Regions:
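Acidic, Ser/Thr-rich low-complexity linear motifs
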Residues: 15-18, 62-78, 116-128
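Ampipathic, surface-exposed secondary-structure segments
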Residues: 108-149
């Protein structure tokens, strides 16, 4: 919010690398929290924190240099996936499978758009985020309300996300 308010006042506002780094560090703190909240099934908290991280990514996209922007935007699909997953799970808690599926499909479309138009990836369907949302969709349509992922799958996802976020 601070940087947005400054940007609103200053026409030529840009984030320097240090400010971008500080925003990314803040995003990492929120990342760790929303991962924990997801495990605790606090989906409202996940939605709140992922929105915050998407806001951070928007500020970086609008006001940071190219290197900082590229470094940060690679995380956008994952944050969007977590946001979509939490919204979906809330609808499933309300037994609203149709709305849950609508949210999932919209999330997949939005993530594909980011992969194609922001990250310039010609094959977004191969991304781990799309895979996870499709897996959730499959579990909803075939098996009812999804169950917990098997431990091996969770570990594989965590490894992929750690590699993407360079957090190993």
């Amino acid at each position: 919010d601070l940087y947005r308010s400054i940007a609103a006042k200053e026409k030529e506002f840009t984030l320097d690398p240090r400010q971008s780094f500080n925003l990314r560090q803040e995003g990492m703190q929120f990342y760790h929290r929303y991962l924990s909240l997801h495990q605790l099934k606090d989906y409202q908290g996940v939605i709140r924190d992922t929105r915050h991280n998407l806001d951070i990514l928007n500020v970086i996209a609008n006001y940071a240099g190219t290197v900082e922007n590229i470094t940060s935007q690679q995380h956008r699909p994952y944050v969007m996936m977590m946001n979509t997953s939490a919204k979906t799970m809330l609808k499933l808690e309300d037994n609203d499978k149709l709305e849950a599926l609508r949210i999932l499909k919209a999330g997949v479309r939005q993530i594909k758009h980011v992969y194609k138009n922001v990250l310039e990836d010609p094959q977004p369907d191969l991304s781990p985020e799309i895979f996870q949302l499709r897996e959730l969709q499959h579990r909803i349509t075939d098996d009812g309300v999804p169950t917990e992922l098997p431990v091996l799958e969770k570990l594989e996802i965590e490894l992929q996300m750690a590699l993407l976020s360079e957090n190993y």
